[in-house]
Amino acid sequence: MKNIAIIGASGYTGAQITSLINAEANLSIQGLYVSESSLDKGKPLSELYPAYSHISLCLNPLSEDAKQTIVATADAVVLATDHAVSLHLAAWFYQQGLAVFDLSGAYRFSDVAQYPKWYGFTHEYPQVLADAVYGLAEWNSDQIAATKMIAVPGCYPTASLIALKPLSHLLTDVLPVINAVSGVTGAGRKAQLHTSFCEVSLTPYGVLAHRHQPEIATQLGQEVIFTPHLGNFKRGILATITVKLKPGTTLSDIQQAYQCYDSAELVTVKQNQFPKVDDVVQTPHCHLGWKFDEQTGYLVVASAIDNLMKGAASQALQCIKIHFGESVK
C-alpha cells in the first residue's frame, strides 16, 4: 500500500485525483492539503464537492509541520498547485526523497531558458529539473518508472502528442496545425468573468502565445501552429490536427504508425471515424480518429480526451501506477 499526499486538493484537478486515488485498492490518501491562506482550509472535501460525499477527508493547511508529516508518512506527493508554487514544493519534496507527480508546468521544460518567457519566473532548481521526466504515460513509461520527479503533461499537449508522436517519422517541414477546444474547467475553479455562465461561448485565446505550444513542439521535435479555444461545455478537449506527410506516404504507412497503440489500454484509434467529447468525458481514455488524402498528402487526425482526466488527474494516476509497478487500466 502506497500513501499519497495531495496538495491543492480544493481545485478541480486536485479533487478529481483525490477521487481516483480513493478508489484504488493499492493506494491510500495520506492527506489532503491546501495553502495556509486558503479559505477552504479545514473544510471537508465533500462540502466543496458533494459528489464526493463518500470521501470523509478534510482539507488541511500545508504548514511546515504538515510538510514534515508528509515526508515521514507518505511515499509520494501529487501537486495540483500553481506553477510558481509547484516550483518550490516539488523541489523540496523531491530532495526529501519522495516521489513527486507535479501537475503544473514547473518541470515540463528541460531548458531553464524557457521559464521566464512562458511561466514568468526563473527556474531555481536546475538539478531537480535535470532529473525530471515528462510524464506522457504511453511514451515514457520506462523513464517514469525510474525517476522520482515526474512532470505530468498539460491537457492540450496530451491530446496533441498522443495523436502526433506516432507520425513523427512521416512529417514534413510544413508545420502541423492544431485547433483544440477545451471545456471551461480547463480554466480552473476560480471565478472569472470570461468563464461565467452568461459569458461563455466559443472563442480562441492565447493565439500564437499559449505556453502549451512550445511544450508540444519540444516533445514532438517540431514546431507547430497551436490555437486553443474555450468552449461552452464543462469538460473535455477535442483537438483537430492537420498535417502534411512525406511524399509517397500510404494508408498502410499510417496504419502501421498507429499500431503502436494496439496494446495501449487507454488509447483507441479508428480510421475514417472521428471521436466526440461525450465519449471520453469522465473516463481516462483518449480516442483518436484519422483520415488521409493520398492525393494531397494531408492527414487530419482528431483527438478527444477529458481535460481533467487524461489531460490531468487520470494521467497522473497512470504515472503513479507505472512508477510503483501497478498495472494500468
UniProtKB/Swiss-Prot annotation:
Q: Which NCBIfam families match?
A: argC
Tell me the active site: 155
The record lists the lineage as:
Bacteria, Pseudomonadati, Pseudomonadota, Gammaproteobacteria, Alteromonadales
GO aspect biological process, one term: L-arginine biosynthetic process
What is the protein name stated in its UniProt record?
Answer: N-acetyl-gamma-glutamyl-phosphate reductase
Main location, first listed in the record? cytoplasm
What is the organism of origin for this protein? Shewanella pealeana (strain ATCC 700345 / ANG-SQ1)
Q: What Enzyme Commission number does this protein have? A: 1.2.1.38
Matching entries from PROSITE patterns are given as: ARGC (PS01224)
Entry function: Catalyzes the NADPH-dependent reduction of N-acetyl-5-glutamyl phosphate to yield N-acetyl-L-glutamate 5-semialdehyde.
